[in-house]
Design a protein with these regions (language model features):
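Aliphatic-rich helix starts adjacent to a transmembrane/signal segment
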Residues: 33-50
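N-terminal single-pass transmembrane signal-anchor helix
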Residues: 7-38
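Short, well-structured segments within or immediately adjacent to enzyme catalytic domains
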Residues: 46-47, 51-354
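N-terminal secretory signal peptides that target proteins for export/translocation
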Residues: 1-6
């Protein structure tokens, strides 16, 4: 028979102290690993987002004469304002696209009147940061998480609270610190309202503009704002069959490599943000492995286009800190020969199959 009086019911204080020390040490050792695993899991989810977007792009092309999804409203055409039923005729393709973006958001949100009525963002080229709205509208939701890198926590918050303008870039006005993109137009409500419908993924410019001049190009002191180059550009009307090497040409890409410390801008050579190629595959090769960029002001010059990264308020800062003047090769953002060109000579083998 067991002598219950002599049975040990638990740890002694000394043993318990040893267990606590060991558990604490193991937690300290495992914490970075678990953090990396979670980040890598989110990275795979981001690649899955891009794969889904690629499938939707293919379906859009089938339904729209093989067009690459882009704004289709045109200068000189007459359209109806959903907020009041009046008609209007845009004077440029840039303005027409802004009105089309407003129309999409009117229908998606119902915000056609009141304090948070959707305004027309005519002060900006909406193609630059909101080309995805055409495909999002086609997919049925402009606020789907498929447009957000799971590591992009800011964009997730802006999407969840689209009318909390205080949360978004320049919601508190222009930053007091130097080294940010301080164009005053960022702090207007017609721009603030758009962040709730933004995306972590950027569309390459040649998906919505010509491979030749006239076109658009970044202004000298920031990669975020564009100006027309060589005249009045015709926007949109690009087709998938114009892409000469679909497996080697980037279509959309993570603007930041958020799986790395500091979430560096895609143009740093050592980064490997996920990239959706025109054939629907996912490329995770490092940026420096891509071919050099070409000047968007002179596509025939052969000169490599470099530019410093100037952060938007609430965006990741440069690797060298605010004010970093390092010139970065923009690689696949400005592809030599546009849709006819090659970004990665050796295509990435990563292809999602679901």
């Amino acid at each position: 028979m067991w002598n219950l009086k002599n049975q040990r019911s638990g740890f002694t204080l000394v043993e318990l102290a040893v267990v606590v020390v060991l558990a604490t040490s193991m937690s300290a050792l495992l914490a970075p690993t678990l953090k990396q695993v979670r980040s890598q899991g989110r990275a795979m989810s981001s690649e899955g987002n891009l794969w889904t977007i690629g499938q939707a792009s293919g379906m859009y092309a089938l339904d729209n004469e093989n067009r690459i999804a882009s704004y289709s409203w045109r200068a000189g055409e007459t359209y109806i304002n959903l907020s009041n039923g009046s008609s209007f005729t845009p004077s440029s393709d840039q303005d027409a696209a802004a009105f089309q973006a407003r129309d999409i958001l009117y229908r998606a949100t119902g915000r056609t009147a009141g304090q948070f009525r959707i305004l027309t963002p005519t002060s900006r080229l909406v193609h630059r940061r909101y080309s995805h709205l055409i495909l999002a509208d086609y997919m049925g939701s402009v606020s789907d998480r498929v447009w957000v890198d799971p590591n992009d926590f800011n964009q997730a918050v802006w999407q969840d609270f689209p009318t909390f303008y205080d949360f978004v870039p320049y919601g508190q006005g222009l930053p007091s610190s130097s080294g940010y993109d301080n164009s005053s137009s960022w702090a207007t409500n017609s721009i603030r309202q758009m962040w709730g419908f933004g995306s972590s993924y950027q569309t390459v410019p040649h998906a919505w503009m010509s491979d030749e001049l006239p076109s658009y190009a970044p202004i000298s002191d920031t990669p975020h704002l564009f100006v027309s180059a060589g005249g009045s550009p015709h926007l949109g009307d690009r087709y998938h069959n114009e892409v000469a090497f679909p497996a080697s040409k980037v279509y959309m890409f993570e603007e930041f490599d958020r799986e790395r410390v500091g979430a560096p801008y895609f143009a740093y050579g050592y980064t490997n943000p996920a990239k959706l190629m025109f054939d629907g595959s996912i490329n995770t090769m490092v940026t420096r492995a891509a071919n050099d960029s070409v000047s968007p002001f002179d596509f025939g010059s052969g000169s490599t286009w470099t530019q410093r990264y100037l952060p938007i308020d609430k965006f990741p800062v440069p690797i060298g800190g605010l004010g970093d003047s390092t010139e970065l090769n923009m690689h696949y953002r400005w592809t030599r020969f546009g849709l006819q060109g090659i970004d990665y000579p050796t295509p990435s083998p990563k292809v999602f199959s679901r």
